[in-house]
Amino acid sequence: MKSEPEAYGIDDLRREGTTLWDGIRNYQARNFMRSMAIGDQAFFYHSNCKPPGIIGLMEVEEIGLVDPTQFDPDAKYYDPKSNRDKPRWDCARLRFLGEFQQLLSLDQLRQQYSEDQLPVIKRGNRLSILPVPDATAADLLERLGPLH
């Protein structure tokens, strides 16, 4: 799950403990989020920064929540076409599990994995939520080492 550290970074999640992962306005990313289950782990990926990469780990606490920002005209992610009776956009509640000792950069990820193993490395990929195959996730966790 990608976020720009200036908008919401791993330090924000550490401080808050949990967060609503809201503001998803792409149907494919929304559908990936809908496929998550309570207890799933998610990598926290800092994007649009130098260097971008995997920095932390989160756990899914709640799923299928209605994204409140879609109804708020003052919110950045307001969607005037969204309807309270049939909302378009969901969010999930995520819990901070920890930060890795070192960020695993996009360049390092590209050297170690294929696009099939890790879709986030595909050039031009703008989705903020992407699945990671189980075997790749296990390998990443081993490479990244313990959380702190």
Say what each PLM segment does:
Residues 1-38, 136-137, 146-148:
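Compositionally biased, charged N-terminal/linker segments
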Residues 56-127:
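Aromatic- and Lys/Arg-enriched surface recognition patch
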Residues 2-4, 45, 97, 124, ...:
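Structured loops at beta-to-helix junctions and adjacent beta-edge loops in soluble globular domains
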Residues 99, 123-144:
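Charge/polar-rich, low-complexity and marginally structured segments
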Residues 45-52:
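Short, charged beta-turn/beta-strand-edge "cap" motif at the junction between a beta-strand
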